[in-house]
Amino acid sequence: MVQKKPINRSLRGRFITFEGGEGAGKSTQIRLLAKRLEKARLRTLVTREPGGSPGAEAIRSALLAGIGKLIGGADAEALLFAAARDDHVRTLIEPALARGEWVLCDRFYDSTRAYQGKLGAVSLDLLNALQQVTIGDMKPDLTVILDIPVEIGLARAAVRRGSETPDRFESEAIDFHRGLREVFRQIAAQEPERCVLIDANAEPEEVADRIWQAVRLRLLEPARAGAKSA
C-alpha cells in the first residue's frame, strides 16, 4: 500500500456511497439512481465493497467465507478489508473520478467503522491508520444511509438469498444487526454534511425519490450553479 494523494474535488465526477444493514435495499437503490444519472447524461460507474476490482473481488470471496475468524478475528478482517479497498480505490475509483464519472459504491469505509470498529472491537487507532494509508483524505461527496428495522431487513435478505447459505455477516445474531443499525444512525447524525439518512422501509420507488432529491439538492444543483458562474 502507498500513501494516497487527496482527490481533486473540482472534478465533475462525484463519489456517492451507500450504507445500511442487511436487506436495506442498497443494490436496488444504486441501480435506480444510476438510471436517473445516466438519463441526466452523466457517466456512471457502479461498484461495491469489498470487491469492485479483480484483486478486491478475490479478497471478498475469502472474507464472506469467514477467513477473518480463522486467521485472527476482527483485526485480521480489518487488514483484509484495507487491502481490498486499496486495490479498489487505486485501480477503479480514482481513475473513474479522474475521467469525470459519477461513482456509486455499495459500502465503503463507514461499513468498516461499523462492522470491524464498533461491533468488531478493532481499535480506532488501527482503523484510522489503515484509512490514511488506503484513501488518505478522500471522502465520498455523499453517503446515503438506508435505515430499516432489523427484522424487516433480515427477512428481505432471507428472501433474496433463497436456498443459499447465509454469508459471514448475515449469520450474525440479531443483537449484532441491531447494534449495526444504531452505529449507522450515529454516523449520519455525526456527519450531516456528508451523510443523509433515508427511511428504507417503503416501496423502492418512494425510497429512490428521496435519494434523488438529496442528490439533486446536494450535488447536482451546486455543480450546475458552479458551472454557470465559471
Curated annotation (Swiss-Prot):
InterPro entries tied to this protein: P-loop_NTPase, Thymidylate_kin-like_dom, Thymidylate_kin_CS, Thymidylate_kinase
Please indicate if the UniProt record lists Kinase as a keyword: yes
Identify the residues that bind ATP: 20-27
The disulfides recorded in the entry are none
- UniProt-recorded Gene Ontology molecular function terms: ATP binding; dTMP kinase activity
Question: So what does this thing catalyse?
Answer: dTMP + ATP = dTDP + ADP
Alphabetical keyword list: ATP-binding, Kinase, Nucleotide biosynthesis, Nucleotide-binding, Transferase
Cited Pfam families? Thymidylate_kin (PF02223)
Q: Which PROSITE patterns match?
A: THYMIDYLATE_KINASE
- Output the superkingdom of the source species: Bacteria
EC number, UniProt record: 2.7.4.9
**CDD domains in the cross-refs:** TMPK
Nucleotide-binding recorded as keyword: yes
GO-annotated biological processes: dTDP biosynthetic process; dTTP biosynthetic process; dUDP biosynthetic process
List cellular component terms (GO). Answer: cytosol
- Enzyme class of the recorded protein, top EC level: transferase
What this protein is reported to do is described as: Phosphorylation of dTMP to form dTDP in both de novo and salvage pathways of dTTP synthesis.
Family matches, as PANTHER family: THYMIDYLATE KINASE, UMP-CMP KINASE 2, MITOCHONDRIAL
The entry assigns this protein to a family as follows:
Belongs to the thymidylate kinase family.
What is the protein's given name?
Thymidylate kinase
Taxonomy-wise, where does this protein's organism fall, top ranks first? Bacteria, Pseudomonadati, Pseudomonadota, Alphaproteobacteria, Hyphomicrobiales
